[in-house]
């Protein structure tokens, strides 16, 4: 099930009023804790588990896990700080926040962390010990104060905070250096602030992060799971000097929040380096010259460039002298320059030579996203799969196998040298039912990958249909197959993938159950013992088994064949997806972007603009491309081409029958072709986005075109470039496009320059990968120059015009 379905099922398992209680827990799907002190109990839902954990008296319950299909609860004394985690299907682990936290709130009487040394570095005496000091406070005299081991605590509400008896015979007790939780104050620039302040400095209410009104934006909580973008609380997801929020005032897009700095010393910093590691956010060397040889401006000065990247605003970023630094999450260290004509530039920092161990893997730089659309498939259980897919079945990005963040694990290249654990590619190192990976979402430990098993004959993949092709009724019993995750599957398969017959849904032998029965789920098709998916499990239909030792297992239901040979957004040739340039030349694999068209004058045949095929009869382009003439017969469209000047057998040439300009003078236009294009493996439409969909900040997208290459190689052949989307809030900063970008536009580009769409690429596509297909998110519109540093390209935001596009296609 996708994230929304998981949340829905989760909420259904709660009783009224339990949501607030769970705020004190951190949940992780697919994670099970190895525990020695535990109780296994029957439970009807998460709320029952919660009550059992809170009411446990035999031991301190720090976590519990709920197994929905087993209707079982396991309450445990351990948590992920003290015990190892294993991956498991159909389980959600809940851990009490207070036992995971290493900070204090107020005077710290609720602190339950594991600090066990005093401010002076002396080890603490165990609270239950009587040597070298006989305690006044012990576990027996104060059983509710968390006096475990030798951890710092505050059982007497001391105003100076947590303390402990020391192991120094001459020092009875001393205080501990526990940092404040960033709830009512912030350290550094508030990157880790987790409080509930939700008003700006001027008193405006904050807009909820998951809302797109009144301000549409790209800081989507699901795309930034580690940024804690909850409710409408002030946060700092993008390297600003302090937390901020979008406001509920339509005339004020965003504003900083007034959050005080914490008064206690900040948590210990991460290791620092004299060389480049990752993005260089922990670089503390003394390079003070940019890549082009410009001397850096001092961070504390405001000439020749005024800025807010000051030592005062970024107190933890070591903005000393004029040394190159990366205070705001750029791709590398940089500095403002002393040249008044060049505001800032990256620096060239020598790379650290020693390779990181798995524990030291830099999680700040995720690997390049590998998103094969030409459907790779796997044989058998996928242990031999060595493809490059790195996307899960719900569209989440995979964590690198060598990384330990956000999920620590033992499935490393060192431990499984023959499993092909490269980068973050989907693999099956442990003989599971198919390739899987750990995810980059802290709340979802792992998922199976968005891959399909190769068919028994021919090795090809049975394609999944588009939404419009899904049947509304039950599957045809003669073609026992499923669509999507099989939630609507009504076939008659009644055996698991392992060959075990299914137990009837109404039966209570050999397994008793009460959640998934014909009575509790009358619309789920729980007939006889047929495989079904009543809970929307992402892994597909399942059943309780007739094996007394195996409660449930999944069924092997094939995907239904698509009614169409080619689906939108799915090329039949895998794109190169190189991080190279259009300017500078990165020649695309022929026909790997099959929606790309060349717009030409009908009489000279000269290419002058790009465009995107969005339906057999329709092309989307930029309105400014049609300034040459208002007559449709002036234009023609070339489809299926790779070479600009060479006509292959697969090239289609179609004249234009109608021009439709956007009525509010936005830079977007529709071309109706004089006849439908023939859809082939070399001519396939791109998919349109959902109306008003917002592309998340830093999403990797792709531009293509035959445009200006400024004398570099590759001219005349279709080129491509990989670009990150830049949130409009960032793009409109004074050092970039200075408030020129409208809400109906989006920015994308490498701020260092060198990668951009240029003259001749106008009107062409900017497509972004989403789960299993490419979506047309932008139409190339304008820019300040071509591939200039600090001047990203600007694209019409297609999602804002989907209603208009669909209406015009219907009416014409």
UniProtKB/Swiss-Prot annotation:
One Gene Ontology biological process: extracellular matrix disassembly
Q: If you read the UniProt record, what top EC class would you report for this enzyme, in one word? A: hydrolase
Q: Which compartment or compartments is the protein found in?
A: Secreted
**Ranges for the Peptidase S1 domain?**
582-810
**What Enzyme Commission number(s) appear in the record?**
3.4.21.7
Q: Which SUPFAM superfamilies match?
A: Hairpin loop containing domain-like, Kringle-like, Trypsin-like serine proteases
Q: Domain of life of the organism in this record?
A: Eukaryota
GO MF annotations in UniProt: apolipoprotein binding; kinase binding; protease binding; protein antigen binding; protein domain specific binding; protein-folding chaperone binding; serine-type endopeptidase activity; signaling receptor binding
- The Kringle domain covers which part of the protein? 103-181, 184-262, 275-352, 377-454, 481-560
Q: Which coarse location class applies to the principal site listed for this UniProt protein?
A: secreted
Q: To which protein family does this belong?
A: Belongs to the peptidase S1 family. Plasminogen subfamily.
Domain notes per entry: Kringle domains mediate interaction with CSPG4.
What assembly does the database describe for this protein?
Answer: Interacts (both mature PLG and the angiostatin peptide) with AMOT and CSPG4. Interacts (via the Kringle domains) with HRG; the interaction tethers PLG to the cell surface and enhances its activation. Interacts (via Kringle 4 domain) with ADA; the interaction stimulates PLG activation when in complex with DPP4. Angiostatin: Interacts with ATP5F1A; the interaction inhibits most of the angiogenic effects of angiostatin.
Other facts: Plasmin is inactivated by alpha-2-antiplasmin immediately after dissociation from the clot.
State the name under which the record lists this protein.
Answer: Plasminogen
Q: Which organism is it from?
A: Mus musculus
Task: Provide the taxonomic classification.
Answer: Eukaryota, Metazoa, Chordata, Craniata, Vertebrata
